[in-house]
C-alpha cells in the first residue's frame, strides 16, 4: 500500500507478473461506486485522527489504539478488493501482514525499532491519502471522459492530446477540481511524480530475445492513475462508457465502440457487445422496407379474415408465409422493390418472394 511499481513496455504494462494494455487501471478505477468511496474515505479519516497517537503515543495508548486501528485497516483493504490494482492483490496475505503489524505483540518493535516504526507510519499515511487520491482522480477523469473524450469522432493520440489539453486548461475544470473535498491533498495533476529505471525481461513476442523494460515507481496512487491515463492515451487507449451496462472500459483502437465485452446485465447469456448488436439489428429491421410492407400486408390479411373474406386457416397460412419471407430480407440484404405480387386471390400480398429476389 505504501508504493506501487509498474513495468512499462510499448503499449503494455506489467503488474504482478501479468500483462495489461496501457490505461487499463485508469479506466477500471472509474467503476468504483459512490458507497465504496464513502467507505474508504471514512476509514482514511479515522486513520488521520489516529496518526498522531500512533506516532507519539506511549505503550498504554498504543495498546488501546491498535485493535481499532486494525479494524479500520481491515475494512479499507476488504473494500479495496473491488478497485484495480488492489483487486489483483492476494488480499488475504496482505491482511495477514497487517494483522501482525497491528497486534499488541508487535508493540515492542514499534517502540524500540525506528525502522519498524517508520514503516508502520508510512502505511498509515498511505491509508490516509489513498481514498482521497481515488476520489479526486475519479471525479477528474469522469469529467474528462464525459465532456471531452466521449464526443471524439476519432480516438487516437492526436485527438486525445488535444482533448486533454482543452480539459486541463478549461476554467470550468479548475473550478471542478477546486470544489472537491480537500482539494489541496492529492490533487489531480497532469505532471505525475515518478522515479524510473530500466530492467530486463524476455520479449513477450519472442522468448529467445531480451528487451529493456521501463520500471516506474510511484509513491502516490494519484500519480500512478494519472500516469496510466496519460500513457494509455499516448498509445491511443482511453476510457469510454459502455451504453449497455453503463460501466467504463478501455478502448484500444481509433474507432469508438459503444459496448464493452463484459456480460450484459439485461441478458447474462450475451456480452454487452452482442446484446447491443442484437438491438441494433432489431432497430434496423423495424425500419426496413420489407418489414414496413410486412406490417401493412399482415394487417390487411387480418382485416380480411375479420370481415369474412378469407378463412382462419387461410389467414394463418398467409401470415406464416409473410413471416418466412420477411425474415429473409434484412439478414440477406434482400430489398423489396417495385410492386407487391398478389397471392391466392385473397388480396394478401407478400414481398420478397423468389421472383422479387431474383431480379
Spans of features found by a protein language model:
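Short helix-coil boundary/hinge micro-motifs
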Residues: 1-250, 281, 285, 289-308, ...
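Cysteine-rich micro-motifs
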Residues: 254-275
